[in-house]
């Protein structure tokens, strides 16, 4: 239904101003940001399509899963929504990036990674949306407080493309007591390969020589993360 056909107090913008953002659904909040639809497609329908958006190259049942998953949408993903021109795409990408940065800042300010879930959420924010495969390391102090997150390698990850010496040097630089290894799978699956397991064991053995523990190796994809420690693969 076009917004002009709704009662004034049911229109998203007016509803937000009168009752606050908590009174709006995810679709309505997106509609406020989009402002207008196009001929034949109202802004509420456009907002609904965004929330149901499938990631480029994904299977039919592998979508963004609502507003949380939409945080990982790229500009190319948004191009597939009819009527979403460059200006609106740029606004959305900027808002989504601000949201990711705000969430990442909140997580970093907590400083202590007390649970595997906290680590997975933090890494998802930083790695899940990347279009290429990256290998990153969380460097932690003796109280599991974050010292640094560094992306060390890019491309298909193997034992030969990830250099243990570089990981050791960065751990010494940060005076880390422990690390969490991480990489992303842009394909969407988080199942570890045999190469992932072998790489983990190589780094675990190498870092043990300088008394740095490998607490976990986390594999992330949009909307999903896997802890190899929780799977008993460490």
Swiss-Prot record:
Molecular-function GO terms, alphabetical: metal ion binding; metallopeptidase activity
GO biological process: proteolysis
Pfam families on file: RadC (PF04002), UPF0758_N (PF20582)
Domain of life (superkingdom): Bacteria
Domain MPN: 112-234
Gene3D superfamilies xref list: Cytidine Deaminase, domain 2 (3.40.140.10)
Binding site for Zn(2+): 183, 185, 196
Motif JAMM motif location, chain numbering: 183-196
UniProt entry keywords in alphabetical sequence: Hydrolase, Metal-binding, Metalloprotease, Protease, Zinc
UniProt family annotation: Belongs to the UPF0758 family.
Protein name per its UniProtKB record: UPF0758 protein Rfer_3252
Organism name: Albidiferax ferrireducens (strain ATCC BAA-621 / DSM 15236 / T118) (Rhodoferax ferrireducens)
Lineage: Bacteria, Pseudomonadati, Pseudomonadota, Betaproteobacteria, Burkholderiales
């Amino acid at each position: 239904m076009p917004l002009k056909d709704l009662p004034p107090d049911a229109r998203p913008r007016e509803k937000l101003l009168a009752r606050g953002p908590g009174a709006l659904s995810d679709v309505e909040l997106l509609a406020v940001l989009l402002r207008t639809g196009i001929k034949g497609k109202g802004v509420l329908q456009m907002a609904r399509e965004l929330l149901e958006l499938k990631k480029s190259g994904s299977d039919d049942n592998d979508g963004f899963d609502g507003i949380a998953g939409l945080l990982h949408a790229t500009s190319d993903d948004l191009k597939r929504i009819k009527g979403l021109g460059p200006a609106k795409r740029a606004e959305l990408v900027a808002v989504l990036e601000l949201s990711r940065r705000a969430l990442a800042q909140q997580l970093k300010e907590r400083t202590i990674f007390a649970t595997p879930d906290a680590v997975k959420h933090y890494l998802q924010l930083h790695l899940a949306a990347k279009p290429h495969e990256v290998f990153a390391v969380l460097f932690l102090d003796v109280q599991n407080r974050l010292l640094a997150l560094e992306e060390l390698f890019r491309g298909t990850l193997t034992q030969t493309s990830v250099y243990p010496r570089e990981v050791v040097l960065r751990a010494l630089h940060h005076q880390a007591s422990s690390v969490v290894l991480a990489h992303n799978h842009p394909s969407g699956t988080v199942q570890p390969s045999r190469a992932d397991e072998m790489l983990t064991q190589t780094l675990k053995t190498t870092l043990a020589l300088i008394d740095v523990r490998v607490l976990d190796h986390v594999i992330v994809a949009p909307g999903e993360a896997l802890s190899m420690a929780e799977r008993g693969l460490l």
